[in-house]
Amino acid sequence: MFKKIATFGLSLSLAAGVLAGCGSSADETGSDASKGYEPKELTVQFVPSQSAATLEAKAKPLEELLSDELGIPVKVSVSTNYNTIIEAMASKQVDVGFLPPTAYVLAKEKGAADVILQAQRKGVNDDGSEKDELVDFYKSIFVVKNDSGIDSVADLKDKKIAFQDVTSSAGYVWPAATLMDNDLDPIKDVQGTTVKGHDQAIISLLNGDVDAAAVFQDARNIVKADYPTVFEDTKVVSFTEEIPNDTVSVRSDMTDDWKKKLQDAFIAIGKSDEGHEIIRDIYTHEGYVVSDDSNFDVVREYAEKVKTE
């Protein structure tokens, strides 16, 4: 059974339902309800794909760049988990959220967010090295130790697996679907444990706390500096299907003019040398392109597939 948190026993629809009480209680400073929301100070929040303190330190330089582009103050922070950023957007506490696909879909269903941009990343080879080409998708992988005796998804039965939050696309949803495709129930047939950050999943594996880690491809790179032999000590036993890249999403009541301003600002930052270095360091993003909600229909299909009772 899953340990640490009960949300692994919840369906994604229930995860969304938990947010149902999040009303628009915040002060609508800087907006006219009849015209839509126009921020006087922009609040931007990230989800913790790695240590929250590390991620916030990497993201803080974005404040000045965005402020210069938009002409207003900008505040950047990191949420405690995937659900809290959705809650914050639903309650009008956060204007812009860097949401992974499943979290975006949940936020959209709540009426809390609209997608404006999608990240571009460099493709990743099976050995973890980067490709030169930019892609609009990524994959999740199951990583195990070389000497584990685990050679396939089927071998994960009854094994302890490090997952991310239930709304994490690469850290839970796609891996859970892969387990199901191999006749394994992600709740009953494996021992799931939740960790905060894909780096922590790999570290837990290396420390022997878990038998496998479900992470984005290839999260081993983010711990390589501290664990130089991580690639030699581990192997990938399965790759998931493609996952749409992360979103830049905004609160749903924002005016179209401000949505366009933010699109232009993030695209410009991604093209600048300083900005590119920052966004690459945060989430391995290489730049941004305008996106549409229909790009995430496949995410809805996967979310429906992995619902549990």
Which residues fall in each region the model found?
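Acidic, polar ligand-binding/catalytic clefts
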Residues: 87-90, 94-155
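Short beta-strand-to-loop elements that line the ligand-binding cleft
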Residues: 73-80, 95-98, 188-197, 235-238
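An extracytoplasmic/periplasmic, membrane-proximal ligand-sensing/linker region
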Residues: 36-46, 50-70, 250, 254-309
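Bacterial signal peptide processing site
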Residues: 23-26
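Bilobed "Venus flytrap"/periplasmic-binding protein-like clamshell domains
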Residues: 47-68, 79, 120-121, 136-202
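A ligand-binding cleft/hinge motif common to bilobed small-molecule-binding domains
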Residues: 101-112, 178-181, 206, 211-231
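Short beta-strand->loop
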Residues: 113-135, 190-191, 224-242
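C-terminal motif of bacterial Sec signal peptides marking the signal peptidase cleavage site
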Residues: 17-21
